[in-house]
Amino acid sequence: MISGLSHITLIVKDLNKTTTFLREIFNAEEIYSSGDQTFSLSKEKFFLIAGLWICIMEGDSLQEQTYNHIAFRIQSEEVDEYIERIKSLGVEIKPERPRVEGEGRSIYFYDFDNHLFELHAGTLEERLKRYHE
C-alpha cells in the first residue's frame, strides 16, 4: 500500500550551484552530502524542503525545457518576496499565465538544469471549488 511520497530526485550538472539555488529559494536544509563517495549512480546531496526529501545527483542537465514541474505551496502575501529571491539568483521567471479567478497566483521558473518549479499561492480545494462554480 502506498503511504505517501518518499522523495524526488533531480539530476544536476553542478551540485554546489544547485545547493545554493535550493537554499536561497526554498530554504532547503542540507541533511547529507556523499562528498567524493558514490553510493548510488553518482555523487549526491539530500535536502529537506517543508519536510519533503529532495535528492540531487550529479549528471547531465535536461536537454530541453518542458512543462513537467514540481509545485510548492506558498502564501499569497509571499509572492513578491519569492520573485525577488528568484531574480537575485539570475534565474528567469516565466511570465504569469492567465488564471481563473480564485485559482491563486503562481511563479514558474527553471533551475540551471531545465527543471521547472512552481511556487503556488493556492490549494487544491480552492481550485476545485472554482472549477465547479
Curated annotation (Swiss-Prot):
Summarize the protein's role: Catalyzes the hydration of fosfomycin.
Q: Which UniProt keywords apply?
A: Antibiotic resistance, Cytoplasm, Manganese, Metal-binding
Known PROSITE patterns for this protein? VOC (PS51819)
InterPro entries from the entry?
Fosfomycin_Res_Enzymes, FosX, Glyas_Bleomycin-R_OHBP_Dase, Glyas_Fos-R_dOase_dom, VOC
| VOC domain: residues covered | 4-122
As for family, the record states: Belongs to the fosfomycin resistance protein family.
Q: Please list the cofactors this protein needs.
A: Mn(2+)
Locate the active site.
Answer: 44
GO molecular function, a single term: metal ion binding
- Domain of life, per lineage: Bacteria
Outline the subunit composition.
Homodimer.
Name listed for the protein in its UniProt record: Fosfomycin resistance protein FosX
Q: Where does Mn(2+) bind?
A: 7, 69, 118
CDD domains per record? FosX
Task: Give the CC-aspect GO terms.
Answer: cytoplasm
Which Gene Ontology BP annotations are present?
response to antibiotic
Annotated organism of origin: Listeria monocytogenes serovar 1/2a (strain ATCC BAA-679 / EGD-e)
Its subcellular locations are: Cytoplasm
